[in-house]
């Protein structure tokens, strides 16, 4: 896996397609490596004529880890957030956005379409707001503005997210913990086949496992707080996609994200949770392609994709 130096750290990356084609940068979410992007999704973008760039966020995969910062106390952070106190983190989402920008610069890419998922969409939002000259368009999937008062995860999703492996030294226990989490937050109407889910998790764990990095990324998200003002400054064409059945980042968060970004287009997908299930890849590719090529209808009425 190739690496590059950006923003003072090592970042693992991968590219697919013709470097002369229109570039599209994929930014994944909490604890998710670049290999978590479904192969058919990446291949589909290449077939549509894009030059696909994906990378491991800091503290994840094969990119630089920040173990020297230690593991944050999430319980204490939650209490502080409830009291309205300012949270400190090992790094900020702004730093992660600078990482993404550094990847583009290191690869000689002047401008790119940006597609972000969950935390990755938050990073994409910051990138689009702070560096609009480098972003052709933004697609924000299953994410949030961080505005106070928005609903949080369901009890089941929160429990699965905070659950630790029965034996943190046993790879099978770790695999079961991740499979349980992904199954819990996944799309109820479009479940990922069990064998495929386990194969993906096993591949990820063989490549890298950094639980401390997940916690530090969670702190970066928590410390970011309300980004509504930043979202209102985004001027690049923006598409917001959200699942109506998302238990981790509820639909209200996606609706608010679209409402905050001027001119944003909203697509709500019925039965979709907090994942990119095989059954929806074709639909997601069509939406992203139409948005990137400026072929979406100009109205701002939310569109609902209902399972046939």
Language-model segments: residues:
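Catalytic active-site module of serine/aspartate enzymes centered on a nucleophile-bearing elbow/loop
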Residues: 264-308
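Active-site nucleophile elbow and catalytic-triad environment of alpha/beta-hydrolase enzymes
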Residues: 164-167, 213-230
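Conserved HGGG/HGGXW glycine-rich cap/lid loop of the alpha/beta-hydrolase fold
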Residues: 9-83
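Acidic catalytic loop of the alpha/beta-hydrolase fold
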Residues: 245-249
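Conserved alpha/beta-hydrolase catalytic His-Asp/Glu region
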Residues: 172-215
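Short beta-strand/loop motif that positions the catalytic acidic residue
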Residues: 234, 240-242
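Conserved acidic catalytic loop of the alpha/beta-hydrolase fold
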Residues: 87, 94-112
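Flexible "cap/lid" loop of the alpha/beta hydrolase fold
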Residues: 138-168
